[in-house]
Curated annotation (Swiss-Prot):
Pfam families: Zn_Ribbon_TF. This is Uncharacterized protein YdjG. It comes from Bacillus subtilis (strain 168). GO terms for cellular component: plasma membrane. Keywords: Cell membrane, Membrane, Transmembrane, Transmembrane helix. Gene3D superfamilies: RNA polymerase ii, chain L (2.20.28.30). The gene is ydjG. It is a single-pass membrane protein.
Length: 341
């Protein structure tokens, strides 16, 4: 994607400011609303002949950024990403959630998160080895799904009552049928091959009411990755994400029974609508003991996900504390019951 925003004052490049929600010039300090920036200062095209592709030498990740960028840091592995061949394909998303957390705020939030690790090494908790923090828009498909559900079940309702000296149990048997229609809106599924699904799922939720019509200005100063999977390819994952919610709703419709034995369940889910969006993520590359650790932060909420290193000493001390506490509790119970140490 080729995008260039020139400052009306000094002609320098402008970037999206997550704190003010406007375009900001780092040279002269001018700020402009995205909608009010003069058109003659905007050069943006979705042309197959002009979009640039940057490919990381280390991990092979394919990144998209402004045309004037010649080198950057790979958000996936922290390595250098270089300009490669030109792209093909239409890369314009329908919606975007802009960054609301600045790079400085992201760094502060990450340092705070590091210090909360009860089982992480002290050297890691100091959070003084941040190699890079890169703002990146990750491609997602949003799905609006409709599920038609038919369920047949054998149910019982048991109640007891006294009759003279006897306690009687009465069991009623029912055949139950449920015909359910459910709608699920804006189910997100990440469309990046390089991003782990588990990592992206943990970054949720985003506030999807903040989705905005896509404008190229939101990408100024950030990296955007193209999608690797179509909505058709990701439809099975979208259905999988709502399966537990469907089961939970089915269960709620059988309240009041003592037992429920589902003997037949049919679920038909269709894709009512799907659209391509970009969601903000801060990728953090952190060096610790000659190893690089990659973390992701929700660029809207500040939620951090990733696997920090674990201190074996702290883990051993933690288990020793649990074992010691359990031993002491058992001895106290023994004393109260008349036993002794």
């Amino acid at each position: 994607m080729i995008i260039s925003y020139k400052c009306p004052n000094c002609g320098s490049d402008m970037a999206f400011d997550s704190e003010t929600g406007s375009l900001s010039c780092s040279s002269c300090g001018r700020q402009d609303n995205i909608e009010s920036l003069p058109k003659e200062n905007i050069a943006a095209r979705f042309s197959d002949d002009e979009a640039k592709e940057y490919q990381c030498k280390n991990c092979g990740a394919v990144l998209i950024t402004e045309a004037e960028t010649t080198a950057t840091t790979c958000s996936f592995c922290g390595g250098a990403a270089i300009l490669a061949d030109r792209l093909s394909g239409h890369l314009a998303p329908a919606k975007v959630i802009p960054f609301t957390i600045s790079k400085q705020e992201a760094e502060q939030a990450f340092r705070k998160w590091c210090k909360k690790g009860l089982l992480t090494p002290r050297g890691f908790m100091s959070a003084d080895r941040i190699k890079s923090i890169t703002g990146m828009y990750i491609p997602f498909w949003m799905f609006d799904l409709n599920s038609e559900v038919q369920v047949r079940a054998n149910c019982t309702r048991v109640h007891q009552y006294e009759e003279g000296d006897y306690i009687c149990t009465e069991t009623e048997h029912f055949e139950a049928f449920r015909d359910i229609n459910l709608d699920y809106l804006k189910i997100p599924v990440d469309a990046s091959e390089k991003m782990k699904d588990e990592l992206m799922d943990k970054l949720e939720p985003y506030s999807y009411e903040e989705l905005k019509d896509f404008q190229t200005a939101y990408l100024a100063g950030y990296i955007a990755e193209k999608y690797n999977y179509t909505d058709e390819e990701l439809f099975p994952r979208a259905k999988e994400k709502i399966s537990s919610y469907i089961d939970s709703y089915i269960h709620s419709t059988f309240s009041g029974y003592t037992s429920v034995n589902v003997r037949d369940k049919h679920i038909h889910t269709k894709n009512v609508n799907s659209f391509y969006v970009l969601l903000p993520v801060w990728m953090v590359s952190y060096d610790y003991e000659r190893a690089e650790h990659i973390f992701a932060m929700n660029g809207q909420t500040g939620k951090v996900v990733g696997k920090p290193p674990i201190s074996r000493g702290k883990v051993a001390a933690w288990f020793s504390g649990i074992a010691g506490g359990t031993f002491l509790a058992l001895k106290l119970v023994s004393l109260m019951m008349g036993g002794g140490f």
